[in-house]
Amino acid sequence: MIKYSSNVWIKIILFNLFIVACLGALMRFKIGFEFPYFDQKKIQHAHSNFAFVGWVTQTLLVLIVGVIAPFLNTIQLKKYNQLLWVNLFCAYGMLVSFIIQGYGLFSIAFSTISIALIVIFTILFFKQAAQFKQYFQAIKWFKGALVFAIFSALGTVALAYMMVTKNLHQTPYLASVYFYLHFQYNGWFFFACMGLFTGLANKFNVLIKNDKLIFGLLFWSCIPAYFLSTLWAHLPIWLYIIVVAAAITQFVGWILLLKSVFYHLHLESKCSNTMMFLIYFVAIAGFVKFTLQ
């Protein structure tokens, strides 16, 4: 059960990070030195897919289950735990198969299973969301995160199709890559982290003011903000205007969030100095990110 094996998951996740780092070092080694045993492109695919599925996604899923575990019965918790192990299995399957064959039958099969797993996880979460009343503000962020996780898979499907059919053209290839990356980074990762932060605030009985408005601004603006990654594609002026509006909307949403968080000054007395440092660090990082957009 997840509540009794948190230390195990932490060790697994850290080991997965170690593998990601080793693959990254190997790719850089091959740039400067002869190392014929592995294909650079295949290692790159293995590195990126394992980093996303085996490290970041695994971490977020474990943390989300950790938040909701106290509200689950034994059967429900067992289902989530099984999904975590299946995701881990898929991640290692992708790691090995991408190194050996690149985009092929087995790597695509493991990728497909990992996508199906996220869909199943999302369905379970949505069904049981009413149980997590203490973290009612965090739930909407988790829901948004899972929706974007599924949505980002469209980019993976498009990439797999182009790789298998050898029908590679620069514009659709890059558009698919950026589609996947945008809805992973700015969708799945960002909203899951926001859910974890909001859940922490709820735990200390701190409610985020205008939470629904902030969520709505950031969620709906995330979709057209994808085109910020495709400005090189010579977008029509009407779409460019929408993209600019989306960037401004995200900035406004972030400012409202910061205003609400720092309004609750008593939060500081309930958090350690390390936690407060992380909160300020994230606040500044997010401000810089949305300002640059």
Model-derived features with residue positions:
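Hydrophobic alpha-helical transmembrane segments of multi-pass integral membrane proteins
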Residues: 1-293
